[in-house]
Amino acid sequence: MSRRFRGFLPVVVDVETGGFDAGRHALLEIAAIPLELDDAGQLVLGTSAHAHVVPAEGTQIDPQSLEVTGIDIHHPFRLAKPEHEALEHIFAAVRAAVRRHNCQRAILVGHNAHFDLGFVNAAVARSGHKRNPFHPFSVFDTVTLAGVAYGQTVLARAVQAAGFHWDPAQAHSALYDTEQTARLFCRIANAWPAPSPQG
């Protein structure tokens, strides 16, 4: 894997949030799936990590965002973690995968990836977390990839164009969206031959 992406391990991430402004709105849910290579050299989904997040002090939540995501921040079974603890839960799994593949660091894969990375970076800064495994600005964005591969930029339509089922009832769950984005990325990336070691 370390040779496939120049020492970067692709890790698919989705966040659910209290709005669109990473500096102002709360991180509410995060999921991550490091990718693996199977025996045939094809990218496949690894083991997921997932956490609900307690809105950090001083952050805001737009009620319209909760209508879209369906998140009930007061649900008794939400079992949300404080932001620093949630990040560490995700980052520990990512760091372990980076080490296992002898990679230098993780690169975030996402649908509108800079949105997800922006919220991750804002949460890192806010919580004082010192061990962020992700590249600070480089990403693989499935909006661009799906637009080129299938002419589709909306996640649901891109996933269906790639030949997968999309369940609207599960959409806007960070874990479900991460799984679907990961399948989409793998389908597109696996259609290309692996680069030569010199490439």
Specify the residue positions occupied by each region the protein language model found.
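Acidic active-site catalytic centers that drive phospho-/nucleotidyl reactions
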Residues: 14-16, 116, 141, 177
